[in-house]
Amino acid sequence: AVFIQAQEAEDEEDESIFELSPFSIQEDESIGYQALSTLAGTRIKTALRDTGAAISVITPEFLEDIGAVDAASVLSYSLNTEVSGEQGNFAGGVETGDDRSNPAVNGQRVRGISPASLTRGYFLTDIPFDSYNTTRITINRGPNSLLFGVANPGGVINNQVKLATLGDNFGSVKFRFGERGGNRQELDVNGIIIPGRL
C-alpha cells in the first residue's frame, strides 16, 4: 500500500499545471447610440448585424439625450411603434381581451398590430419600466425567438434593469423640473460595503 501511495504522489508532481487566461463577460457592448449585440431574437448573445429580426436597441446615452423616463417617451422616438396618451402618436386603444387596464402597459402598438409583450430580462412582466433602473431597452418587432418564446404578434419590449457593480463606488443625483410644476428626482448609488466581499 505504501508503494501505491508513493507512485500516486509522483504522478501528481509530474502533471503540469495549466493557468487559464482570465475570462470576463461585459455587460453591454455599445458605442454611444449604437448597440452591437443583443439577446433578442435568438436568446443567444448575437451581433445585431447577424440577427434576422427587426430589433431596435435603446442605449443609456439615447435615453438620457431624449429625456425619456417611461415607455411612452421611449416609444415616441422608436421605429414602427405607436403610443397613446399625452405624448402619443395614435388615438384609440387596442382591445386585447385581457383584464389589464393600465395605460402604461396597454397604451402602445408595435407594427400597427397590437401591444408588444413587456419583459424584464426577457421574463414577462406587467411592471412598467422607468429610466431610473433601466440600462437598455430592446424592442423586437415581430416574433421573439428562433425556436420558441413568449410574444404577442407585435413583438417584445424588453427592459434590462440596472445591476449592482461589485468592487466599484459611484453615484449620481439628478433633478428635473418641467412645465406645470412637474419635477423628478433620482438618486443612484453603488458602493462597496465590505471590501473584497460585498
Annotate the PLM regions:
Residues 22-29, 110-114, 141, 161-163:
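Flexible glycine-/small-residue-rich
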Residues 133-135, 141, 145-198:
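Outer-membrane beta-barrel translocator/receptor signature
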Residues 6-64:
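Short, acidic, small-residue-rich periplasmic hinge/interaction motif at the N-terminus
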Residues 15-22, 50-53, 58, 103-105, ...:
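Extracytoplasmic
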Residues 55, 63, 74-75, 137-142, ...:
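Non-catalytic regulatory/gating segments with a bias toward low-complexity or hydrophobic composition
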Residues 37-48, 52-56, 66, 70-128, ...:
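Extracytoplasmic beta-strand/coil segments of soluble accessory domains associated
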Residues 1-5:
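C-terminal segment of classical bacterial N-terminal signal peptides
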Residues 30-36, 118-119, 181-182:
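Short, solvent-exposed loop/turn elements at domain surfaces
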